Swiss-Prot record:
Function field: Weakly inhibits Kv1.2/KCNA2, Kv1.3/KCNA3, Kv2.1/KCNB1 voltage-gated potassium channels, and Nav1.5/SCN5A voltage-gated sodium channels.
Family: Belongs to the neurotoxin 14 (magi-1) family. 01 (HNTX-16) subfamily.
Protein name: U11-theraphotoxin-Hhn1v
Disulfide bridge map: C75-C90, C82-C95, C89-C110
CC annotations in GO: extracellular region
Length: 113
């Protein structure tokens, strides 16, 4: 019975001592990994920041240029009355006083240039 107790005690002491060594090694590994992780996170953060700055530059460039798809808003078509002080005739039209057939209306109309 003593032999079993001694054997058990010996195994217990070995397990505890080896467990402590593993614990220290694990702690050191975790510190190394966190340091590597921090450097990786810094690298990833810088890369993401560069990409965001590039996207922002592209967006600002697109905003400054006139888009091909943009159109004039609320323009007045041909033959429609307009205000001589604030003409809103569509592109290619001019706000002019009518000739002959529209004289009695006393208003300006949008005509082709």
């Amino acid at each position: 019975m003593n032999t079993v107790r001694v054997t058990f005690l010996l195994v217990f002491v070995l397990a505890v001592s080896l467990g402590q060594a593993d614990k220290d090694e694990n702690r050191m590994e975790m510190q190394e990994k966190t340091e590597q992780g921090k450097s990786y996170l810094d690298f990833a953060e810088n890369l993401l920041l560069q990409k965001l700055e590039e996207l922002e530059a592209k967006l600002l460039e697109e905003d400054s240029e006139e888009s091909r798809n943009s159109r004039q808003k609320r323009c007045i078509g041909e033959g429609v009355p307009c205000d001589e002080n604030d003409p809103r005739c569509c592109f290619g039209l001019v706000c002019l006083k009518p000739t002959l057939h529209g004289i009695w209306y006393k208003s300006y109309y949008c005509y082709k240039k």
